[in-house]
Amino acid sequence: MKNLMKELNIMDKFEFKFLSFELDPNAPKESKINLVESMAKKYHMPVEQSRKSIEYINKLGKAEGLDFRNDTSRLGNTFNAHRLTKYIESKGNYENTEKIINLLYDAYFTKNLLISDEKVLIDLGIQAGCTKEEVEKLLASNEFTKEVRQDEEAGYSEGVHGVPYFIINNEVISGAVPKEEMKEVLLRVLKNEEKKGKDGHPEGVVCDETGCHFKKK
């Protein structure tokens, strides 16, 4: 997303906020099945179809210079990872917030670390500007539970059931959207802002059970 915004020279037109969303809030600390099997089970699809979907996501990542290895990801509960992110965000340093998110992505998608493991979270937290004691104290508490749940409830209310998802000017874009399609969305949002009507409601993207599309004039 940000690479595309830089290409379009529109980074200064948007403000960013990271939101929490767990695909499986009831997941165990470490799952006994891999991502391919998990997706097949969750979305009631053949294992081979699930594998191809993951390969497609890996391909999209590589096109953006990201070394995704989803097929060997270690699944586990991500709640504490979200709490850690919220904690770092609360300290008001955007760079560290972005850093912990990138570290978590790298740990999960590329290094295939178990991000429910407290030792992993402590190490990542330290790299993102926290002390070991800070992270240990956070993990031993219930702090930032409310903040994570509020983000998730907001996502559910918008019809979100998977990741990635983006909310651009209150419009939801779900799924791994191809670059050209995302480019079209971003430029359309900016154009709509410029020609916003008197009622203050721009044209935008509509999402329903069939996917996301632009409103017809």
Describe each PLM feature range.
Residues 2-108, 201, 213-214:
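Structural alpha/beta surface segment adjacent to cysteine/selenocysteine redox centers
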Residues 1-10, 85-217:
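C-terminal cap of thioredoxin/glutaredoxin-like
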